[in-house]
Amino acid sequence: RLALAQLPAATEIGRNARQALHLAERTRDDGGAFGLVPLLEHRIVDHVYSYGIAAAETVPVALALAVAAGGSPAGAVPAAACLSRVADSAPALTGALTGALRGPAAVPESWRQACRTLSGCALPWLAGTDLVELAGRLVPGDGGTPGG
């Protein structure tokens, strides 16, 4: 609900966010985040205008899926990937929101390990870079969070 205060009601993103959260609350006990996917697909995601990364769709979808999954990254992120028009942006934003809500321990260990070390695909000189170690060097005094 705090997010809605930042989204003006008279804007596309504000209207979509309010509708998406209403859908999430209405269908909370009806399949969780995955049960919400068809509703978001048809009521929030625009299938005419072909700019699927628009914030007016991605932000509401991420908010609604986070609510429907009870803040669980494992419940919300895969559902976000099922919305084809926003699949390039919604999973990342949904993961960021649920991670911020629940903390790093809520992210499944298998996900953390799969994403921890860079393969160097786009930037070969970064192959083998451990992102947790790098984060520990960037945040003074933290020293890295084990398993984070």
Describe these PLM feature segments.
Residues 54-144:
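Catalytic phosphate/nucleotide-handling subdomain of diverse soluble enzymes
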Residues 1-84:
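Accessory "access/gating" subregions that flank catalytic or transport cores
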